[in-house]
């Protein structure tokens, strides 16, 4: 994380995913908090996880860090269920690929949270993403998405 924070501009949103099921979740949450704290990246870091307990631990350790709760249509582990959402008090909700839901998006937005969705759930269609007012997009094709964004912005101007 240190290398990423040092390489990218301070206002660039960085989505850090804590990939943990059970063992080590407190350690990972504390290490993530230490790194965000050391770099003072409060507004430009989102720490996300499928694991609500690790996000709760992060919230207890450093409540200033923006938390993102990832969910999926299919949950391999019951702990990934959205029933734990109130415990986490997430700032962002992050549907896993193929899990975007417009009704949930509106519910989270009305509660003051933002949604970070996968570009593939919208077939990388900027117009569709703009229509639902996505706050951010996850992509594995950064340059392609930047080009699409530029093209879309040019059409609007």
Language-model-detected regions and their locations in the chain:
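Short loop-to-alpha-helix "cap/lid" segments that border enzyme active sites
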Residues: 2-157
